[in-house]
């Protein structure tokens, strides 16, 4: 098969369809040897396309492939002979099945694809709920809908969450906060080391031979939460009922939320060295392509000034632990910035469990509100005890994480009220129930925006695990 190539478009980084052509724009020095490797998805045949240096501008290389059917091919880049996954890819092939151990046989390889939008947004209206009415319900798409009571063919997917929108709405919540729903590696991928030639014979004798593609169950650990470097432009395929239609399934979830006058807010974690241009482009992409209503940004060294001043994001809620309010545009009409940190959590826990409580500090937290900024209040988040475990355990019990109970927060300001873990004693059960109700009342009477973790409304327990990042159960 022969492909006709011309120079691409340097304005937009990534791979995308434009008419009957596909444009591939990626970072590369002019001196680099660059190739696009295309894979026919059905026939599995590969095509190596050289991208000449003449298609360079600055540190970008861009090529247009004419008469190209995006749906038939996956791709990856070869830069100086080294395989690279496109950080701007809108589809990731290879992770369609959650925690698929068979991927070890293929060395955990993934490839990229080009998304083809198929959702009509013309009638979509974003609610833009003010902070005086906003109530957050945080959930993990897979964990929220994998319970056995209502388990069905699409448990653990966007469709399952969509089916429970009315359950969330009837509790009074206005906004859904989703833990990472972009593509990330949930499996523990072995790190490859290059062994020098002079030690290879000795090294091969030391190795214990295992069956190809075999994983020792004792060494497996799933990254359930997803707070790691991700493929920030691709919807997680394993969260979809039909992985090949993941983007549209997520879009339909957002549409249904909007029809019920509810918001969709995404958590996005960016490691320290993430390119700032990529971060801004990713936020733009989710706002344009999926009409999401906000982001809870996690990570240090984020381009917050650029995000705050970005015109496209001016009506998108931004949740972060701090902001420089001096850079906020003076003509900003919509209050879209929210301080989100654990400063409410600890005074509330200390008062509820009678642990060195400072009433002045607690009262300040209860009534705090900014003139042009909101505050997110919570007593329990995914990082720490559940609300129920806060009154059932004095100490963490993270043994099942496989780290000798050394992981997770050491200071929880919790109280087991006389018995560690579940108890049959009426006095213990009654006081725990009272404390749970006190916590909910305190949270929802505070001036800030309340947030609860999915399951806290039904007294969900993690058996004292305050760092359940690898617990898929």
Show where each model-derived region lies:
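Hydrophobic faces of well-ordered beta-strands that scaffold small-molecule active sites
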Residues: 135-137, 176-178, 264-266, 295, ...
């Amino acid at each position: 098969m022969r492909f006709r190539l011309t120079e691409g478009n340097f304005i937009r980084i990534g791979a995308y369809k434009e008419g009957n052509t596909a444009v591939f724009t990626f970072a590369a020095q002019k001196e680099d040897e660059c190739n696009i490797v295309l894979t026919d998805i059905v026939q599995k045949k590969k095509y190596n396309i050289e991208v000449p240096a003449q298609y360079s501008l600055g540190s970008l290389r861009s090529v247009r492939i004419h008469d190209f059917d995006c749906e038939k091919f996956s791709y990856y880049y070869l830069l100086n002979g080294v395989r690279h996954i496109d950080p701007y890819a809108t589809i990731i092939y290879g992770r369609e099945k959650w925690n698929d151990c068979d991927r070890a046989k293929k060395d955990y390889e993934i490839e990229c694809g080009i998304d083809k939008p198929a959702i009509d947004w013309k009638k979509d209206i974003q609610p833009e709920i003010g902070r005086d009415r906003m109530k957050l319900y945080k959930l993990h798409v897979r964990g929220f809908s994998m319970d056995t009571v209502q388990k069905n063919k699409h448990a653990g997917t966007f469709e399952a969450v969509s089916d429970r929108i009315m359950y969330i709405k009837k509790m009074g919540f206005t906004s859904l906060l989703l833990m990472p729903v972009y593509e990330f590696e949930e499996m523990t991928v072995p790190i490859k080391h290059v062994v020098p030639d002079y030690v290879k014979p000795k090294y091969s004798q030391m190795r214990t031979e295992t069956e190809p593609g075999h994983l020792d169950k004792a060494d497996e650990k799933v990254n359930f939460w997803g707070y790691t470097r991700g493929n920030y432009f691709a919807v997680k395929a394993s969260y979809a009922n039909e992985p090949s239609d993941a983007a549209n399934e997520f879009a339909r979830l957002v549409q249904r939320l909007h029809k019920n006058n509810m918001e969709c807010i995404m958590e996005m974690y960016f490691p320290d060295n993430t390119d700032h241009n990529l971060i801004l482009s990713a936020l733009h992409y989710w706002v344009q392509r999926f009409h999401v209503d906000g982001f809870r940004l996690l990570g240090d060294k984020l381009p917050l000034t650029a995000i705050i001043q970005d015109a496209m994001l001016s009506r998108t809620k931004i949740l972060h632990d701090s902001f420089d309010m001096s850079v906020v545009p003076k003509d900003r009409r919509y209050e879209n910035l929210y301080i989100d940190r654990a400063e409410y959590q600890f005074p509330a826990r200390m008062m509820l469990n009678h642990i060195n409580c400072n009433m002045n500090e607690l009262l300040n937290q209860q009534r705090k509100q900014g003139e042009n900024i909101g505050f997110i209040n919570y007593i329990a988040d995914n990082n720490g005890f559940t609300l129920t475990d806060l009154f059932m355990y004095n100490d963490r019990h993270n043994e099942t994480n496989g780290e000798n109970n050394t992981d997770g927060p050491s200071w929880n300001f919790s109280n087991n009220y006389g018995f560690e873990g579940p108890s049959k004693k009426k006095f213990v059960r009654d006081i725990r129930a009272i404390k749970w109700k006190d916590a909910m009342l305190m949270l929802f009477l505070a001036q800030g925006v309340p947030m609860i973790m999915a399951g806290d409304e039904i007294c969900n327990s993690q058996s004292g695990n305050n760092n359940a990042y690898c617990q898929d159960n």
